[in-house]
A protein has these predicted regions:
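Pyridoxal 5′-phosphate
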Residues: 1-4, 8-257
Length: 257
């Protein structure tokens, strides 16, 4: 079904102005064909935005190749500071947009009759900028570029394949989301153990997972669960980390079941 993934026809009408999709699910790890989806949206005359917060840290991204009108990323998911993000936009689109807030350095001229605004991106960056966060985010992005995004992707693809094999057959464990095109994000449930209780045991074993809805409660419920645990890979994850999860889960099963 991955090959058929696209925007449903009924979701695109002549009234559609903007289509926003995620590049990679932070719950399921599913990687979406955003280039194809962008073409669909543009055929209907709509703008196209990619939420790449989960996507951009795991593989190369070329906004010109994707032909997206907007692309958003966060700082903390790119190994950078919290409280900052980036919105890429095609300049011709940004030029048509009014500022959403006012403040210093985003105004060109002010008179009693009218105000003119600076060209993008300055018109969207009102007030004192988050200079420290911006410098930190820039260094984080430079670090990933030096490592090479293709190298990071190859490393994580190997871990993802290994985890599918190792975790997919664990007794009493269900992996949530099994798309072929998948990144290093694994949500899972263990029969008879609440994810929060499981996380407590895993934490004692030196394994950090997140539990809950992962800011996507409708999706988690659509998959048939109230809450799930999630293990994610990064550029620092190694095979030994993947191998550490099964015995830790077995310890939790012995404790609670």
């Amino acid at each position: 079904r991955q090959r058929q993934m696209c925007i449903r026809d009924r979701a695109l009408t002549p009234r559609t102005k903007l289509v926003a999709v995620t590049g990679m699910s932070n719950v399921l790890g599913t990687i979406f064909p955003v280039k194809r989806m962008a073409a669909q949206a543009h055929r209907q005359g709509a703008l196209f935005l990619v939420d790449a917060c989960q996507y951009i840290v795991h593989q190369p991204v070329d906004v010109q190749d994707l032909d997206c009108d907007f692309l958003a990323i966060s700082g903390h998911k790119t190994y950078g500071p919290t409280g900052i993000g980036v919105l890429y936009g095609k300049y011709k689109v940004l030029e048509t947009m009014p500022p959403y807030q006012c403040g210093g350095d985003m105004v060109d001229t002010v008179t009693y009759d009218k105000t003119t605004f600076m060209p993008p991106p300055a018109r969207f960056e009102a007030g004192t900028p988050a200079s420290v966060q911006a410098i930190g985010l820039g260094e984080a992005l430079n670090y990933m570029q030096k490592l090479g995004m293709n190298n990071i992707k190859a490393h994580e693809d190997g871990l993802t394949a290994y985890a599918r094999e190792l975790w997919g057959s664990l007794p009493g464990v269900t992996l949530v989301g099994t798309a072929k095109e998948k990144g290093g994000v694994f949500s899972f449930v263990v029969d008879g153990i609440h994810p929060q209780d499981l996380a407590f045991v895993l934490d004692k074993e030196g394994i950090a997972v997140r539990t809950g809805h992962h800011c996507a409660e409708p999706l988690v419920h659509r998959m048939g669960y109230e809450t799930v645990a999630r293990a994610s890979f990064g550029l620092y994850t190694v095979r030994e980390d993947v191998e550490a999860l099964p015995p830790a889960i077995r310890k939790a099963q012995k404790m609670f079941l």
